[in-house]
From Swiss-Prot:
Biological function: Is probably a protein kinase regulator of UbiI activity which is involved in aerobic coenzyme Q (ubiquinone) biosynthesis.
Keyword field contains Cell inner membrane: yes
Annotated keywords: ATP-binding, Cell inner membrane, Cell membrane, Kinase, Membrane, Nucleotide-binding, Transferase, Transmembrane, Transmembrane helix, Ubiquinone biosynthesis
Topology relative to the membrane: Multi-pass membrane protein
Lineage: Bacteria, Pseudomonadati, Pseudomonadota, Gammaproteobacteria, Pseudomonadales
Primary gene name: ubiB
Any matching Pfam family: ABC1
Protein source organism: Pseudomonas savastanoi pv. phaseolicola (strain 1448A / Race 6) (Pseudomonas syringae pv. phaseolicola (strain 1448A / Race 6))
Domain Protein kinase positions: 125-492
Localization per Swiss-Prot or TrEMBL: Cell inner membrane
EC code: 2.7.-.-
Protein name as annotated: Probable protein kinase UbiB
Classification via PANTHER family: CHAPERONE-ACTIVITY OF BC1 COMPLEX CABC1 -RELATED, PROTEIN ACTIVITY OF BC1 COMPLEX KINASE 7, CHLOROPLASTIC
Ligand binding (ATP): 131-139, 153
Active site residues of this protein: 288 (proton acceptor)
Amino acid sequence: MKLLAVRRLFRIQRVVIRYRLDDLLFALPLPWWMLAVRFVLPWRWLPRRKSELSRGVRFRLALQDLGPIFIKFGQLLSTRRDLLPEDIADELMLLQDRVPPFDQQVAINLIEEQLGARICDVFSRFDETPLASASVAQVHAACLKTGEEVVVKVVRPGLKPVIGQDLAWLFILARMAERVSADARLLHPVQVVMDYEKTIYDELDLLREAANSSQLRRNFEGSDLLYVPQVYWDWCRPKVLVMERIYGLQVTDMAGLADQRTDMKLLAERGVEIFFTQIFRDSFFHADMHPGNIFVSTVNPWSPKYIAIDCGIVGSLTPEDQDYLARNLFAFFKRDYRRVAQLHIDSGWVPAETKLNEFEAAIRTVCEPIFEKPLKDISFGQVLMRLFQTARRFNMEVQPQLVLLQKTLLNIEGLGRQLYPDLDLWSTAQPYLERWMRERVSPKTLFGNLQSQVEQLPHIAGMTRDLLERMSRPHASDPPRPWHERKDEPVLRLIGAALLVGGAIQGWVMSEAATQLLTLTAWPAAIMLIAGLYLIVRR
């Protein structure tokens, strides 16, 4: 294993030298002792041919040479436009995850091992030549004994050791970058590699992908917008996924779409509607919607329907994130930059101590030039990217779900404008957002929220008792500071006030109840009142 790791290191070094990636490294603001290293690197003494390749192209070619794990890492980096220079991010978008298929017999043996049955006992037909092959898995067409046409996705054998080895080197490089460069620390390279580690290992678990596909299919059951293939759970395993085979046109097949007279304007608008439906209605979105994973049904081209596959990567937003995102978009298009800044602080995306006026000015400086364009030409994805870039200067915490959202929005937006160049994303999205905002404050929604809060009332007494017990325990080795010196005094007093008010309200509500219920439910209110008084008056 150690020998393989050393060989891999030499391979990485050769690729770095070949594409002169050290030029990219030494262009960064590094400590003097790191910059001095360039004078002792032997290959920098040798005469070099003038390269006509840009730094972005060299970086992309280097990742391609290093193999599929680095290719997928580059694809992940391409979504982080808030971290990368634009020229490098554009080049990384061109990375293609295509590798030669592995041996057919190996695939068959692995499928039979996972299913615990022979191929001929499960499938009436199995095509040994794969339909597609990528770094993590390859796909074969087949037909179940029951007659359904399916595809069989099988994970490449022996991937985990290779992934572990490459991830180890990526972590080493990321930690080195954080130690030697203050600028690198702002980009959180270790966190980026950790996000990639989770993504790549999630993709190795095909049961997770099957569950994601089933959820997305259920969300759009009977919809005119999107179709998701059926998963055949009886034949799904951690390394094998069997699902319905779909037939449709690749979404980028403009000639094919034109031949069947597809309504391109409606198709583009429905793509936007699918995105906002996933974000705001379901809070569950397909986060890998590049053109290779999207098809268009050949049925009813005048009312076109999308087909989505490969749900290995999905994202979700909390209700709070949904609300702040919608309000941010409305505030931005009203040019209310103070509101945008305040929402970032209120949401916790940037630190609470951020100076609101400075943050507002920075957002205005970055975003005001965008409005020089007609509204239909403004890119939602670029808006989010600019906002994230600005917020990073104010120590915005990396929000993985928002990164996935930005990536998905850029894909959907780019695809929509490719289908219909005059697509006005804001006009298409605005009615949906306004309807969602109205529903958020509708009596039905408010009643549902109130009901969920009432369901928590029985737990309050237990939580209060636990709080009082913890506060009454003696401190064995670290005696507490005097009450008036404690930094959390205002917070605890605020909690005390909340308990006092909550106890009073609960007592009033229960006093309206029947007498037989009163004796059973009055004691939680009493405990809340006592706890609140204790926290407020204690010295």
